[in-house]
């Protein structure tokens, strides 16, 4: 046991323990160590020397053309141009015969093994020309496959492991949502609490101390929660959040799930690799070397997990997830590409390319896997573009920052744009030939947001201290029409309800919020949460949470609001870091069944109200019992303190010259009485 410094000596200054005796560090009898070296020393054991060191960063490229000395430089240039895309090449060796002709294969050495693995995945079966398809293998694989034993033995059957039910959170009888609260309990130790959002008081499900080292993140459908550790990340699930799988990637800074939760992407620190994992098996599907720049969400997924894409130099690299090879074994060349984004419901990529000397800027919609341009729009005098998909995939908005003129600064190479104005190009994705409408705004744009379910979109424009909020609607076959312009609003962010119709106008610097119903554009309620830095809607659109993170030195915690802006709960939590609602998967009910339920919703009201009354009655009874118990505890505590106070009376009188000062009447000669008159109000009554 560790001892405090002050406990090393007793009151006489003598040592209370003989420290000459050596401590015993042996394990107690019967101790079983269930933690292996791989888990404790994973990073260190990776550096253990092995026989393959020195050759694991070498690849063998077979089926290259056999050429003589005259054509050799051209072959050399072509292969170097291809394989330098996988990483830094250290050396290339071309074996030759007596006549200096190449033998049809070559050895390429890369800077590290990760680059060699990337070259194998990217360029194996690469079609060089009509007669030559490259076969690429790791040099170390030759030894591995040559050591396969001749006598085959069947694999041993493994005992069946009972799997956790990962979807118990969806079977809650009243469909109450879950949320987690993250707070730093001690420096370097993060506590995570899991709650059910029951009314009138939430019910705590579980509390995990030291659950993560930094923060947590839910998967898109709410099946898993991921935690971050020095050795890598771990995903948890089930009713008690048991460990599902772990992924060894040291110092992971960020993770990203695919939309259908089949794959997980872990991003290491700048300069390290990025890994795509299969969530269920825990196997590494593909790895990439970071270029050292900001790489958060560098990979973007199609809605069905069939494709993943990333942007390169004048190209989009689209990979098929069944093999993680490039689609059609080649990238999509796009000169001057600046950004791209997948449709949330279709395999369509929207990208924009900047202006060139002889060509305007351009927005293009590309259908995958056919690589057919289904729509494009030329744009002129473009400084920047932002791509905004509507959640249902019905509309696409491209915010275009345009300028009247530009000039180049003599001191630096930066271009300055003058006379800025803004266009919103609205693509109607469900209509024939995808018509495009344009909305022009002269004022500075502060924020833009689509209604997730519906056809409205909102814009904050003007000066931050005196902004306007405009609401538009994009109807089929019509140009977008302005529904309402709300003037002189001090807001900076827009947060739509996931069910549409309701929106929160937020100013995260001042902590002020306005709750608006966009059916008639009434402001239902306004509220404040000083220094709030985050806003989170629950999946049902019934509740909103605002929170103050650890960046604020005081008033940590979160507020729970109804969708109408009524404050329901204030929670102050020391070192509060994060509040996250648990996502829900899409409903399995078909559209026809949903419409039928909405049509007959009134007949369910009585049932819901009855449940609410029973719940509130039960909650009121529990609340009264809780208060009575707290009162009993207080009375008991007060009685103990009064008893202690009475026992200390003799000591108090000793300190006060044997004078009893417990009551004013004890020593009337030592009491001064002063009468103070205060004028509270003066009334004048006229008598007629």
From Swiss-Prot:
Coiled coil: 612-643
Renumbered ranges of WD repeats: 208-246, 247-287, 291-329, 332-367, 440-482, 527-572
Stretch list, region Disordered: 1-28
One MF term in the entry's GO annotations: translation initiation factor binding
Gene3D superfamilies: 3.30.70.330, YVTN repeat-like/Quinoprotein amine dehydrogenase
Feature: compositional bias, Acidic residues: 9-25
Matching Pfam families: eIF2A, RRM_1
SUPFAM superfamilies: DPP6 N-terminal domain-like (SSF82171), RNA-binding domain, RBD (SSF54928)
InterPro entries: EIF3B, eIF3B_RRM, Nucleotide-bd_a/b_plait_sf, RBD_domain_sf, RRM_dom, TIF_beta_prop-like, WD40/YVTN_repeat-like_dom_sf
Key words of the record: Coiled coil, Cytoplasm, Initiation factor, Protein biosynthesis, Repeat, RNA-binding, WD repeat
Residue ranges of domain RRM in the record: 57-141
Location of the protein in the cell: Cytoplasm
Cellular component GO terms, alphabetical: eukaryotic 43S preinitiation complex; eukaryotic 48S preinitiation complex; eukaryotic translation initiation factor 3 complex
GO terms under biological process: formation of cytoplasmic translation initiation complex; regulation of translational initiation
Subunit record text: Component of the eukaryotic translation initiation factor 3 (eIF-3) complex.
Function noted in UniProt: RNA-binding component of the eukaryotic translation initiation factor 3 (eIF-3) complex, which is involved in protein synthesis of a specialized repertoire of mRNAs and, together with other initiation factors, stimulates binding of mRNA and methionyl-tRNAi to the 40S ribosome. The eIF-3 complex specifically targets and initiates translation of a subset of mRNAs involved in cell proliferation.
HAMAP family found in the cross-reference section: eIF3b (MF_03001)
Family: Belongs to the eIF-3 subunit B family.
Protein name: Eukaryotic translation initiation factor 3 subunit B
Species classification: Eukaryota, Metazoa, Ecdysozoa, Arthropoda, Hexapoda
């Amino acid at each position: 046991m560790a001892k405090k410094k002050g406990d090393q000596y007793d009151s006489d200054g003598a040592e209370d323990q003989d420290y000459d005796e050596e401590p015993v560090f042996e394990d107690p009898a019967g101790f079983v160590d269930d933690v292996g070296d791989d888990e404790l020393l994973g990073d260190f054991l990776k550096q253990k020397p092995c026989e393959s060191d020195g050759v694991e960063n070498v690849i063998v490229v077979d089926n290259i053309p056999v050429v003589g000395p005259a054509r050799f430089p051209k072959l050399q240039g072509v292969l170097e141009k291809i394989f330098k895309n996988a990483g830094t090449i250290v050396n290339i060796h071309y074996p030759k015969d007596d006549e200096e002709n190449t033998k049809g294969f070559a050895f390429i050495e890369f800077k590290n093994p990760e680059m060699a693995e990337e070259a194998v995945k990217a360029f194996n079966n690469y079609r060089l020309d009509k007669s030559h398809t490259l076969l690429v293998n790791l040099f170390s694989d030759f030894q591995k496959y040559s050591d396969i034993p001749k006598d085959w033995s069947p694999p041993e059957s493994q005992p069946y492991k009972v799997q956790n039910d990962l979807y118990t959170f969806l079977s809650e009888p009243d469909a109450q949502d879950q949320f987690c609260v993250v707070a730093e309990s001690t420096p370097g130790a993060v506590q995570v609490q899991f709650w059910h959002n029951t009314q009138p008081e939430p019910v705590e499900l579980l509390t995990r101390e030291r659950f993560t080292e930094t923060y947590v993140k839910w998967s898109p459908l709410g099946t898993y929660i991921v935690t971050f550790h020095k050795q890598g990340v771990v995903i948890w699930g089930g009713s008690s959040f048991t460990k599902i799988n772990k992924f060894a990637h040291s110092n992971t800074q960020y993770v990203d799930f695919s939309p259908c939760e089949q794959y997980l992407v872990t991003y290491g620190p700048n300069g390290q690799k990025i890994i795509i994992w299969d969530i269920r098996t825990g196997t590494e599907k593909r790895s990439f070397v970071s270029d050292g720049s900001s790489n958060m969400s560098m990979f973007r997924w199609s809605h069905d997990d069939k494709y993943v894409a990333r942007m390169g130099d004048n190209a989009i690299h689209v990979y098929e997830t069944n093999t993680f090879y490039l689609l059609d074994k080649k990238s999509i060349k796009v000169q001057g590409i600046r950004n791209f984004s997948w449709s949330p419901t279709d395999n369509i990529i929207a990208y924009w390319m900047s202006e060139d000397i002889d060509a305007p800027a351009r927005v293009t919609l590309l259908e995958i896997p056919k690589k057919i341009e289904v729509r494009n729009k030329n744009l002129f005098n473009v400084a920047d573009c932002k791509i905004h998909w509507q959640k249902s995939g019905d509309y696409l908005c491209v915010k275009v920052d345009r300028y009247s003129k530009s000039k180049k600064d003599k001191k630096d190479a930066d271009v300055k744009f003058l006379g800025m104005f803004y266009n919103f190009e609205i693509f109607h994705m469900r209509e024939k030939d995808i018509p495009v409408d344009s909305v022009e705004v002269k004022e500075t744009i502060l924020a833009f947001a689509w209604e997730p379910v519906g056809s409205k979109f909102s814009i904050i424009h003007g000066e931050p201290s005196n902004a306007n909020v405009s609401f538009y609607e994009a109807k089929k076959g019509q140009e977008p029409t302005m529904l309402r312009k709300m003037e002189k609003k001090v807001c900076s962010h827009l947060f739509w309800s996931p069910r549409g119709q309701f929106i929160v106008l937020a100013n995260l610097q001042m902590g002020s919020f306005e709750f608006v119903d966009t059916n008639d554009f009434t402001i239902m309620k306004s509220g404040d949460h000083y220094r709030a830095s985050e806003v989170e809607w629950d999946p049902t659109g019934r509740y909103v949470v605002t929170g103050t993170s650890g960046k604020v030195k005081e008033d940590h915690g979160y507020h729970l609001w109804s969708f109408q802006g009524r404050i329901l709960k204030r929670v102050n939590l020391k070192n509060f870091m994060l509040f996250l609602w648990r996502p829900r998967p899409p409903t399995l009910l078909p559209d026809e069944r949903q419409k039928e339920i909405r049509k007959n919703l009134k007949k369910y009201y009585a049932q819901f109200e009855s449940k609410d009354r029973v719940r509130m009655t039960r909650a009121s009874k529990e609340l009264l019992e809780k208060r009575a118990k707290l009162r009993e505890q207080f009375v008991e505590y007060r009685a103990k303190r009064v008893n202690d106070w009475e026992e200390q009376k003799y000591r108090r009188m000793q300190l006060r010259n044997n004078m009893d000062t417990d009551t004013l009447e004890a020593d009337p000669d030592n009491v001064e009485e002063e009468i103070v008159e205060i004028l509270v109000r003066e009334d004048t009554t006229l008598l007629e």
